[in-house]
UniProtKB/Swiss-Prot annotation:
The lineage of its organism: Bacteria, Bacillati, Bacillota, Bacilli, Lactobacillales. Its EC number is 7.6.2.11. Keywords: ATP-binding, Cell membrane, Membrane, Nucleotide-binding, Translocase, Transport. InterPro entries: AAA+_ATPase (IPR003593), ABC_SmlMolc_Importer (IPR050093), ABC_transporter-like_ATP-bd (IPR003439), ABC_transporter-like_CS (IPR017871), Mo/tungstate-bd_C_term_dom (IPR008995), P-loop_NTPase (IPR027417), PotA-like (IPR005893), PotA_ATP-bd (IPR017879). The keyword Amino-acid biosynthesis does not apply. This is Spermidine/putrescine import ATP-binding protein PotA. It comes from Lactobacillus johnsonii (strain CNCM I-12250 / La1 / NCC 533).
């Protein structure tokens, strides 16, 4: 796939001295679904606004299809945006809202009619053309906003927290619908969210941001299974994170025990952090466990039990299990070497990738 958007050394500093973006470099390929994921204030919406042309970077460049568009007016970019509040016109019906952009461009009436019909069909709103906006549910308004954006046939569609106003069930339904729409259209979607589940469910690739910097980028599986630092490990899903020490390649120490692991390329004796996901931990009898813990609490969450336990060194453990246990019981905890992920302190994403390639190449 060809590159459609590139940001090179983009920095955004406001008049009050606040730096929203710090040397952002990213590449967006054509035809993929991307998520910009991070907490409030991480810089994700600022990146979206700079791509859209609603905000100019203090320094750096923005490229679209190989052309420098850093100073190009937003209206001249082949990019459309779906805003958090949908920004629909309440005095217009569904057809008029979707047709608005085409009418501004003075397109032929019959061409507009056919384009609007096709866009509404794409978002499963056949027969809604004459409905008033006030008659629509939140999910239907979301679809109208998407139809209004895609009717202009943009090369890139930007979505700014566009599912956040929906209830949980509808939000999940719209995740599937957005992904299907993106696949049918074959255009690039860039989705801004603070919701990890949304990003993991929909994206081909994710950029994880914090404090104006890209912490890690990659596929949902790579980011979940191989977080590059403490922030990513804690922000993407639940984690057990413990202090440890690398013994040698493929062996790490934590909790006063040594364990076989799948990591290498770290100096013997180097202090590290160890990540174990709750769903990778199995409760077993003490004899077969690699660790001993005492169960402190247990919650039933529908598809699993969330169990909190503590070991003899006062380390707290979070375990997701499909089977219940008993509070106060001492149990064994089992995990495979591949379930252990070792993180170096201060290691950048580039350094992590280089180390990963080196030791995977030796296998």
């Amino acid at each position: 796939m060809s590159d459609i958007i590139k940001l090179k050394h983009v920095r955004k500093e406001y008049d009050d001295g606040f730096v929203a973006l710090k040397d952002i470099n990213l590449t967006i390929e054509s035809g993929k679904f991307y998520s910009l994921l991070g907490p409030s204030g991480s810089g994700k919406t600022t990146i979206l606004r700079i791509i859209a042309g609603f905000s100019e970077p203090t320094s750096g460049q923005v490229f679209f299809d190989g052309q420098d568009i850093t100073n190009l007016d937003a209206a001249k970019r082949k990019i459309n945006t779906v805003f958090q509040n949908y920004a629909l016109f309440p005095h217009m019906n569904v057809f008029e809202n979707v047709a608005f952009g085409l009418q501004i461009k003075k397109k032929d009436k019959q061409e507009i009619k056919l384009a609007v019909k096709e866009a509404l069909h794409m978002v499963q709103l056949d027969g809604f053309a004459n409905r008033e906006i006030s008659e629509l549910s939140g999910g239907q308004q979301q679809r109208v906003a998407i139809a209004r954006a895609i009717v202009n046939q943009p090369k890139v569609l930007l979505l700014d927290e566009s599912l956040s106003a929906l209830d949980k069930r509808l939000r999940k339904d719209m995740q599937f619908e957005l992904r299907e729409i993106q696949k049918k259209l074959g255009i690039t979607f860039i989705f801004v969210t603070h919701d990890q589940e949304e990003a993991l469910a929909m994206s081909d690739e994710i950029f994880v941001l914090n404090e104006g910097k890209i912490q890690q980028s990659g596929s949902p599986v790579d980011i979940y299974d191989e977080p590059v630092n403490d922030f990513v490990a804690r922000f993407i899903g639940d984690s057990n994170i413990l202090s440890g020490r690398m013994i040698k390649d493929y062996e790490v120490e934590f909790g006063n025990h040594r364990f076989e692991c799948a990591d290498a390329g770290i100096k013997p004796g180097e202090k590290v952090e160890v990540v174990l996901r709750p769903e990778d931990l199995d409760i077993t009898d003490i004899e077969h466990g690699k660790l001993r813990v005492v169960v402190e609490s247990q919650l039933f969450l529908g598809d699993h039990f969330e169990i909190k336990a503590i070991d003899s060194d006062e380390n707290e453990w979070l375990i997701h299990s499909t089977n219940p246990t008993k509070i106060g019981k001492e149990v064994g905890v089992y995990f495979d070497p591949e379930d252990i992920h070792v993180m170096r302190f201060g290691e950048s994403e580039a350094e992590f990738d280089k180390r990963l390639e080196a030791y995977e190449g030796e296998e």
